[in-house]
Every structure is written in C-alpha cells, then in structure tokens.
C-alpha cells in the first residue's frame, strides 16, 4: 500500500515537471524576449521584470 502511494505521488510529480517543461518551451518560442533562465543577448533581451546577468548571460527575476 505504501509503495503504491509513493508511485502515485512520483507519477504526479513527473507529470507536473513534464507539463512545466512543455509550457516553458512554448513560451520561449512565442516571445521575442527572454523569461526565467533564458539565455539573453543584445538580439534577445529579457522580458519585463527580468534582467540579464552578465556573468551567466541568463535572464533572472528582478523586482
């Protein structure tokens, strides 16, 4: 019984992670700007509320 519950919880977590990954991939192709953990450059700047960190060249959230 405990094993079944663990498998169900693991399965739900896996489905959630997969759906988040697919959603992030779709957002990346739809937008002309970078969102969280997107590579940033002069050609593709970060979206509003995100800033490009020069050391890592990724967009991160900034208030």
From Swiss-Prot:
The keyword RNA-binding does not apply. Keywords: Disulfide bond, Ion channel impairing toxin, Knottin, Neurotoxin, Secreted, Signal, Toxin, Voltage-gated sodium channel impairing toxin. It holds the Pfam family Toxin_12. InterPro entries: Huwentoxin-1. The keyword Lipoprotein does not apply. GO terms for cellular component: extracellular region. Residues 22-31 form a propeptide. Its main location: secreted. One of its GO terms (molecular function) is toxin activity. Disulfide bonds join 33-47, 40-52, 46-59. It is found in: Secreted. Residues 1-21 form the signal peptide. Expressed by the venom gland. Inhibits preferentially tetrodotoxin-insensitive sodium currents (Nav) on rat cardiac myocytes (IC(50) is 0.26 uM) and has weaker inhibition activity toward tetrodotoxin-sensitive sodium currents on rat dorsal root ganglion (DRG) sensory neurons (IC(50) is 0.83 uM) and on cockroach dorsal unpaired median (DUM) neurons (IC(50) is 1.19 uM). Has no significant effect on potassium currents on DRG neurons. Belongs to the neurotoxin 10 (Hwtx-1) family. 36 (Jztx-2) subfamily. The presence of a 'disulfide through disulfide knot' structurally defines this protein as a knottin. This is U7-theraphotoxin-Cg1a. It comes from Chilobrachys guangxiensis (Chinese earth tiger tarantula). The lineage of its organism: Eukaryota, Metazoa, Ecdysozoa, Arthropoda, Chelicerata.
């Amino acid at each position: 019984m405990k094993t079944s519950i663990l498998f169900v919880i693991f399965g739900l977590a896996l489905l959630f992670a997969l759906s988040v990954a697919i959603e992030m991939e779709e957002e990346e192709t739809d937008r002309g700007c970078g969102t969280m953990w997107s590579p940033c450059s002069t050609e593709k700047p970060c979206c509003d509320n995100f800033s490009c960190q020069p050391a890592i060249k990724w967009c991160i959230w900034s208030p």
